[in-house]
């Protein structure tokens, strides 16, 4: 079960087991939990092989403890397993926007149609539902009930057995009524193993409707079997996306998610419960955060985010040294905020030039001095206008007074910040392209 991974993370971070042994134990628990959740065995062992490879090849940044660094790698690789940085676009690209839902029997397609309608209605769109599932007698009544529940009109013809005809007439009716989004619930008469028939029928309705989006609804309980269905669907309908339902009611949700992600298909939503509002946009990183225990890894992710932001500023400084552009006070602000995310002041102050705390182990008094200086500088930066941050040369005495008054500081504090900034730009120009210059400038590498 994936919840076991959360317990393993907590045990790993707080336990006293020697590091190497703790890593081996965690990887075994990770493999066991993923396989129990019906994640494909090859995917599981490929995942853990990548984790081990990174452990051997990469060095932990100084802002992270070894255990924190290991968990950040696990987080990164698990996120890739479930789809990575791919962010689904749920916004309609034009109006009216026609969505066609397809799925096998029992996938939760009709319920999902209602949830999807409610999702878009809450976003301010006028939504219409078309009941074109003519093979399940209760489908029309169920969709009508859902529509009444959320205040969305439903088009259907209970006595008509021609799904394509109903779908076309329903779409035409809602287009005339100026609906923004039209969701068509198509037939779900085929079971798992009958993918060919399902896709043939999907193509027929697609040709008739020419929808803007085709969404395949998959029940999470089929686990890794979702791969074949999702793969064939993705090949047949490149514009399509996928909704995985019933994530709350099965231990195989991870298997289904990883299987679909492996096909390259986009997972747009996941169903997380029976209620009408329990449909959420799928985000792999957010999902992995839940698996690992957000409370346990939040500080680690914050440090990693700070490191990434800091590296962007480092790159900007390299460009400045090569004569490309100029360091602005906005960059300084971003740098300080990034460093503050990375952890205790004792670990990051040495990387900020000009604070007089460039010692390997600064004293408590030096730390207090550095923290106070950072606090004053941030207050001053927060009181500056956009133009002042982008072009500090316009800050004259009257602007200094205004900034000082707005931040509760002395004019001398603002002058000190500007002097440091000017010296910083001069130093960057002097250093030029000498290798290792930024590391020397910042008192040692962070990453």
Curated annotation (Swiss-Prot):
Name under which the protein is recorded: Signal recognition particle 54 kDa protein
The family this protein is said to belong to: Belongs to the GTP-binding SRP family. SRP54 subfamily.
Tree of life domain: Archaea
One Gene Ontology biological process: SRP-dependent cotranslational protein targeting to membrane
Organism: Saccharolobus islandicus (strain L.S.2.15 / Lassen #1) (Sulfolobus islandicus)
Subunit structure: Part of the signal recognition particle protein translocation system, which is composed of SRP and FtsY. Archaeal SRP consists of a 7S RNA molecule of 300 nucleotides and two protein subunits: SRP54 and SRP19.
GO annotations of cellular component type: signal recognition particle
Catalysed reactions listed for this entry: GTP + H2O = GDP + phosphate + H(+)
EC number(s) reported in the record: 3.6.5.4
Enzyme class per UniProt: hydrolase
């Amino acid at each position: 079960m994936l919840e076991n991974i959360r317990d393993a993370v907590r045990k790993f971070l707080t336990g006293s087991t020697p590091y190497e042994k703790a890593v081996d134990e965690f990887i075994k628990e990770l493999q066991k939990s993923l396989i129990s959740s019906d994640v494909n065995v090859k995917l599981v062992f490929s995942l853990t092989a990548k984790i081990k490879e990174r452990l051997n090849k990469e060095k932990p940044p100084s802002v992270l403890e070894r255990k924190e660094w290991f968990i950040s790698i696990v987080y990164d690789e698990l996120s890739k397993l479930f789809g990575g940085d791919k962010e689904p676009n749920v916004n309609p690209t034009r109006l009216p926007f026609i969505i066609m839902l397809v799925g096998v029997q029992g996938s939760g397609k009709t319920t999902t149609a209602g949830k999807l309608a409610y999702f878009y209605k809450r976003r301010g769109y006028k939504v219409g539902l078309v009941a074109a599932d003519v093979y399940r007698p209760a489908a029309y009544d169920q969709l009508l009930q859902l529509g009444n529940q959320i205040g969305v009109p439903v088009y259907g013809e209970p006595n008509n057995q021609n799904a394509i005809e109903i779908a076309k007439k329903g779409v035409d009716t809602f287009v005339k009524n100026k609906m923004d989004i039209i969701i068509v619930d198509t037939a779900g008469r085929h079971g798992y193993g009958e993918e060919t028939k399902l896709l043939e029928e999907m193509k027929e309705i697609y040709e008739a409707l020419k929808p803007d989006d085709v969404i395949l609804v998959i029940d999470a309980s089929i686990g890794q079997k979702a791969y074949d269905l999702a793969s064939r669907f993705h090949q047949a309908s490149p514009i399509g996306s996928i909704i995985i339902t019933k994530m709350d009611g099965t231990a195989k949700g991870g298997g289904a998610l990883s299987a679909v992600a492996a096909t390259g298909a986009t997972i747009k939503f996941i169903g997380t419960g029976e209620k009408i509002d329990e449909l959420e946009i799928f985000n792999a990183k957010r999902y992995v955060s839940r698996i690992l225990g957000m409370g346990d890894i939040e500080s680690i992710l914050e440090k990693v985010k700070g490191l990434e932001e800091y590296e962007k500023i480092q790159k900007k400084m390299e460009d400045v040294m090569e004569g490309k552009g100029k360091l602005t006070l906005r960059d300084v602000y971003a740098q300080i905020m990034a460093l503050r995310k990375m952890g205790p002041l004792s670990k990051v102050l040495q990387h900020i030039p000009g604070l007089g705390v460039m010692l390997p182990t600064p004293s408590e008094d030096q730390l207090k001095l550095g923290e106070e200086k950072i606090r004053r500088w941030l207050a001053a930066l927060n009181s500056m206008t956009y133009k002042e941050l982008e072009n500090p040369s316009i800050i004259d005495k009257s602007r200094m007074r205004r900034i000082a008054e707005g931040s509760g500081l002395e004019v001398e504090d603002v002058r000190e910040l500007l002097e440091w900034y000017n010296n910083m730009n001069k130093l960057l120009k002097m250093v030029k392209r000498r290798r290792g210059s930024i590391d020397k400038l910042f008192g040692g590498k962070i990453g």
